[in-house]
Amino acid sequence: MANPIDQPLTAPKVANPGPLGLAGFGLTTVVLSCVNAGLLPAEAVPVVVPLAFAYGGVAQLIAGVLEFKAGNTFGMVAFTSYGLFWWWFAFLKWTVGAGWLSTPPASAMAVTLLMWGVFTFLLWIVSFRSNKAVWSIFLLLWITFFFLAWGDFGYMIGPWRCGTIGGYFGLLTGLDALFVAFVEVLNATADREVISLGRPIIRA
């Protein structure tokens, strides 16, 4: 009989935090994008604020910390950054709505969203080494940020406000993230690849 001390220790199986972060990001993005696209009235924003604090913010921060522990630099940077984005958004809407801060000029919001678009574009370039599903999320997201920024600058494309177009791109982004989260949970639960998320565009 083998000595138990001599038996190799097996590392406990650790869950993938990615689906949690994607779900928090995707669900919150869909709800806010319904407002940006005009599918919900502006009065619906107070519904988004606690959702952004809790699921959009905290869930992604948890995912970011777990990605850090797993040694995934890309996942850590992405989830932590967008989790803090939702905290920034929620805190801004909360303080302005409570009258603690004055409403910022549209140009300030535009520049902020534009910088988030630039940041997301850079992460999109990095995501060429990830699977095609994650790559598509970042593609749609930087387009969303740019359209929202142009909307705050007051630009239009024909009869369409750029902010409204950004809302529809945001809907696609959020739904894409939710789908990827679902697929990752499904594959993990089945312990096999039920649905493929696509191979990386750049594999070298």
Each language-model region and where it sits:
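A structural feature that tracks compact, well-ordered secondary-structure segments
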Residues: 33, 37, 63-69, 75-78, ...
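Mid-membrane cores of alpha-helical transmembrane segments in multi-pass membrane proteins
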Residues: 21-31, 50-62, 75-92, 107-120, ...
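Short, highly charged, low-complexity non-transmembrane loops/tails of multi-pass membrane proteins
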Residues: 190-204
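Transmembrane alpha-helix boundary signature
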Residues: 92-100
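Membrane-helix interface "capping/anchor" motifs
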Residues: 66-74, 125-136
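N-terminal topogenic module of multi-pass integral membrane proteins
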Residues: 1-63, 67, 202
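Alpha-helical membrane segments in multi-pass integral membrane proteins
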Residues: 109-122, 132-155, 159-183
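Interfacial loop-to-helix junctions that mark the boundaries of transmembrane helices
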Residues: 12-17, 41-48, 101-108, 159-165
